[in-house]
């Protein structure tokens, strides 16, 4: 795919937003559930904690005790489930509120209308220590979590985190600031140091994580859905399968009749581009028995179904989140 096309896709990803309707937890409100909501259209690549200072100011007059908490004491929930603050809001929405189908019908459009704006609850007390790590007033915890995720992606790509470790202090902090400010040009400048344009630096593996929302465990006391995260080495290319090699040899044998002058057995294994379909078939064969067509489940990224034929490396370069990871949500079909 042309670099201009990849850049265009990345621009669209960074421009993607989700309408949010954030309400104050009734137990913390002077008026219980009658507090006015906070409405905002929020970038998919952003993180919910960045909203906490303005939410604390907005709901301050409605809090039973506004002096009892600070902005960094805030956390979010959806239908009673605490939301992991280190996940981008776009991933959280795809996990918990559904994904946009490849083709819309009147029925799915009506469903979208019910899901948007996405209704979240903000809390400034009763921090769920069992589910979430606490934030700090300086934002250091959030920054460090982001940079650690960037390091992990760098290690997966190159077998070492030397790239992110050798960034200047300004570039390291600038990467996080670019994501916070949704500043794509600044982000691209720094990311091009970590992920040089192909083919200057061949990649070892591709940073992709698969998320499988599952029903609550039978032995669990919670009604919250269980979330399984799958990560496996995904190289940019794969070896030719025996059946594919046989087809190549058969074609070579036919052409040896004089059409091309090739001799029987001349076909050699050639690396093939790793696609979303081949990767999913390899990692989750029961859910993806076909490499070409979603049959049982479908991959969702940034609210849209990902084509099975899409090369994984191109998806990483064009549609990764700010930390360099491609977070694909697996949704059952039917």
From Swiss-Prot:
Residues 237-272 are annotated as: Disordered. It is found in: Preautophagosomal structure membrane. Its main location: membrane. Residues 252-272 have a biased composition (Low complexity). Keywords: Autophagy, Isopeptide bond, Membrane, Protein transport, Transport, Ubl conjugation. InterPro entries: Atg5, ATG5_HBR, Atg5_HR, ATG5_UblA, Atg5_UblA_dom_sf, ATG5_UblB. GO terms for biological process: aggrephagy; autophagosome assembly; cellular response to nitrogen starvation; mitophagy; piecemeal microautophagy of the nucleus; protein transport. GO terms for cellular component: Atg12-Atg5-Atg16 complex; autophagosome; phagophore; phagophore assembly site membrane. Conjugated to atg12; which is essential for autophagy. The keyword Hydrolase does not apply. PANTHER family: AUTOPHAGY PROTEIN 5 (PTHR13040:SF2). Belongs to the ATG5 family. Conjugated with atg12. This is Autophagy protein 5. It comes from Emericella nidulans (strain FGSC A4 / ATCC 38163 / CBS 112.46 / NRRL 194 / M139).
């Amino acid at each position: 795919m042309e670099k201009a096309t990849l850049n265009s896709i990345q621009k669209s990803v960074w421009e993607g937003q989700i309408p949010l309707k954030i309400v104050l937890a009734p137990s913390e409100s002077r008026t219980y559930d009658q507090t006015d909501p906070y409405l905002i259209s929020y970038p998919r690549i952003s993180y919910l904690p960045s909203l906490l200072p303005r939410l604390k100011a907005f709901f301050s007059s409605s809090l039973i005790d506004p002096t009892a908490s600070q902005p960094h004491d805030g956390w979010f929930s959806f239908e009673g489930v605490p939301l992991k603050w280190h996940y981008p809001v776009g991933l959280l929405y795809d996990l918990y509120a559904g994904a946009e189908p490849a083709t819309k019908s009147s029925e799915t459009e009506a469903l979208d209308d019910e899901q948007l704006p996405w209704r979240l609850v903000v809390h400034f007390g009763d921090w769920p220590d069992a589910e979430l790590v606490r934030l700090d007033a300086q934002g250091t915890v959030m920054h460090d979590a982001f940079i650690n995720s960037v390091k992990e992606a760098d290690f997966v790509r190159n077998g070492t985190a030397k790239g992110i470790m050798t960034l200047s202090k300004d570039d390291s902090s600038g990467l996080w600031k670019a994501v916070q400010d949704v500043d794509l040009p600044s982000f691209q400048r720094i990311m091009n140091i970590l992920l040089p344009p192909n083919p200057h630096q061949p990649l070892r593996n591709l940073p992709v994580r698969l998320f499988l929302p599952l029903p609550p465990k039978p032995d669990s006391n919670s009604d919250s859905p269980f979330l399984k995260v799958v990560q496996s080495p995904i190289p940019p290319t794969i070896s030719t399968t025996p059946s594919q090699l046989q087809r190549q040899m058969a074609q070579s044998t036919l052409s040896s009749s004089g059409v091309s002058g090739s001799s029987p057995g001349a076909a050699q294994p050639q690396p093939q581009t790793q696609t979303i379909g081949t990767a999913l078939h390899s990692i989750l064969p029961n859910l993806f028995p076909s490499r070409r067509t979603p049959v049982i489940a479908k991959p969702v990224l940034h609210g849209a179904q990902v084509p099975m034929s899409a090369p994984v490396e191109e998806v990483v370069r064009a549609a990764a989140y700010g930390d360099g990871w491609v977070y694909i949500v697996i949704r059952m079909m039917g």
